[in-house]
A protein has these predicted regions:
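N-terminal secretory signal peptides and thylakoid transit peptides that target proteins
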Residues: 4-26
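Cysteine-rich micro-motifs
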Residues: 136-142
């Protein structure tokens, strides 16, 4: 009778199985940059043809003349007529007017940012904290922190992830002659506005 190797006890992985696992992981990581993640991750929509209002929770449109410096509001985008759809995390964005030291007192579009609120680590919802000594985005689940100027994670588990999964998806904004703020049609790709829950390559 042929000698049989002893069973693998205690859930330990043999050296051979470990090497096989590492080889498989390496193969997967090789192709990650070439995957069209927009087809797999739940983004709000494939295309948005026209600009949309930055609509606040009270139904008013954000305006450069009235929105306070160093403050933020959650905004739904793209908004639908279905209240259930509008509750989806992947439609929730943090609209921020930067603090004074980051240019928030300017009455132009450079004073504003709009990032997906879906944390890039495990998809909890982060928020902006305007308190002295903070003035950053913080995820309550595992402590990832985001720079309000760029959307890049600078602390916590999201900051340890490789690009583009360390920078939040961002919407481009514009201001009309009345000071009302609008969202430009996005390009849902890592090299464009990013992919919600996956990230964005940071433009230099």
């Amino acid at each position: 009778m042929a000698h049989q190797p002893p069973p693998n006890r205690g859930g330990k992985v043999s050296r051979r199985d470990f090497l096989k696992l590492m080889a498989a992981a390496g193969t997967v990581l090789t192709f990650v940059p070439f995957v069209d993640w927009g087809k797999f991750l739940p983004n709000p929509t494939a295309k948005v043809a026209s600009r949309a209002k930055v609509e606040l929770a009270d139904g008013t449109q954000a305006n450069v003349k009235t929105f306070p410096v160093n403050s933020s509001k959650a905004v739904i985008y793209p908004k639908t007529d279905d209240p259930t759809l509008n509750k989806e995390s992947f439609r929730t964005w943090q609209f921020i007017r930067l603090p004074e030291e980051l240019g928030g007192t300017k009455n132009d579009i450079s004073a504003f940012r709009m990032y997906s609120m879906v944390c890039l680590h495990l998809w909890c919802l982060w928020k902006y904290w305007p308190d002295p000594g903070r003035k950053r985005g913080e995820c309550p689940c595992h402590g990832s922190m985001y720079d309000p100027l760029t959307g890049k994670a600078f602390a916590g588990p999201a900051s340890l992830q490789a690009p583009p999964s360390n920078v939040l998806a961002r919407l481009d904004l514009e201001i009309d002659s009345s000071g009302n703020i609008w969202i430009k049609p996005p390009n849902w790709s890592p090299n464009g506005n990013g992919i919600v829950g996956y990230g964005r390559f940071l433009r230099e």
